[in-house]
């Protein structure tokens, strides 16, 4: 059963400006270590960061809170499954909100789709509750 849907469109140029202006201060405040490591290896790091930023915004919308009630950008991170498929790893207030959304006897699955076409990056998140196995 689908329990949350969120999408976001991010202007890559805005992320480029934040990277130029604030550098590590920006990346360390907003992105997880895993996200920073992956993005810094990319030839177009601004695009990589923008997709991850859009994913965080989309996830916060799927959680039904936006960036409020203890849900912060740094508490949501893009990770990859062994297959390479992206998903979200949540901590802190974001994880607590996710747990509160999931009906008893179910477990959450977060589906994430990322794309970019300069100057935009887009993310779409679906949170699904499935019976525990």
UniProtKB/Swiss-Prot annotation:
GO molecular function, one term: magnesium ion binding
GO CC field: cytoplasm
InterPro entries: 4-PPantetheinyl_Trfase_dom, 4-PPantetheinyl_Trfase_dom_sf, ACPS, Ppantetheine-prot_Trfase_dom
EC number: 2.7.8.7
KW Transport (keyword) present: no
Cofactor: Mg(2+)
SUPFAM superfamilies membership: 4'-phosphopantetheinyl transferase
Catalyzed reactions: apo-[ACP] + CoA = holo-[ACP] + adenosine 3',5'-bisphosphate + H(+)
Keyword terms of this UniProt record: Cytoplasm, Fatty acid biosynthesis, Fatty acid metabolism, Lipid biosynthesis, Lipid metabolism, Magnesium, Metal-binding, Transferase
Keyword DNA-binding among UniProt keywords: no
Subcellular location: Cytoplasm
GO BP, one annotated term: fatty acid biosynthetic process
Binding site residues for Mg(2+): 8, 57
Entry's family note: Belongs to the P-Pant transferase superfamily. AcpS family.
NCBIfam families for this protein: acpS, pantethn_trn
This protein's name: Holo-[acyl-carrier-protein] synthase
Native species: Caulobacter vibrioides (strain NA1000 / CB15N)
Gene assigned in the entry: acpS
């Amino acid at each position: 059963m689908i329990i949350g849907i969120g999408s976001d469109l991010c202007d890559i140029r805005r992320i480029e400006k934040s990277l130029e202006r604030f550098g590590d201060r920006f990346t360390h405040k907003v992105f997880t270590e895993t996200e920073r490591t992956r993005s810094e290896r990319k030839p177009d790091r601004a695009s990589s960061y923008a997709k991850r930023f859009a994913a965080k915004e989309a996830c916060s919308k799927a959680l039904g809170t936006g960036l409020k009630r203890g849900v912060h950008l740094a508490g949501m991170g893009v990770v990859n499954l062994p297959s390479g498929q992206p998903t979200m790893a949540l901590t802190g207030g974001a994880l607590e909100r996710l747990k509160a959304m999931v009906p008893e006897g179910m477990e959450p699955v977060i589906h994430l789709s990322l794309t970019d076409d300069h100057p935009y990056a887009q993310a779409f998140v679906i949170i699904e509750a499935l019976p525990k196995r």
